[in-house]
Amino acid sequence: EKKDNEDYHFTTDMTDEAIKWVEFQHAMTPDKPFMLYFATGAVHAPHHAPKEWIEKYKGQFDDGWDALREKTLARQKEMGIVPENTVLAPKPDDIPNWDDLTDNEKKLFALQMEAFAGFAEHTDNEVGRLVEAIAEMGELDNTLFIYIMGDNVSSAECGLI
């Protein structure tokens, strides 16, 4: 029945089930530790998220990946994450300059970046719901979180298309 709902999203469903499981474990054996391995599909292809999460990023990548790389480095310098004299790393040869793409390619790749960003933020929000549930149980200070998110650069879907 859930999957027939047009608003269904697997990450949200996983989070709901994880919260139920943690709450059940805590209710049944409050003095025992629990272990939960919570591995979402994000941000592996296909990149999908609820529409409102993708729409938040509408137009934010229209300047392309070259401009985004420069803005990201500038922001990292401003925040003190990297030294002021840090230079932009070379871009891989198989990634073309944004300005060399056709208008249709730019539109497609900007949309893909919007979907990726929306998917990543939606997943982060769902992890936050799980953390909140553990906090409401009074177990947050007694819980170790190991939060790993990788770009999975070696997966088959790498490349532009």
Regions of interest found by a model, annotated:
Residues 1-161:
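Active-site-proximal cap/lid insertion segments
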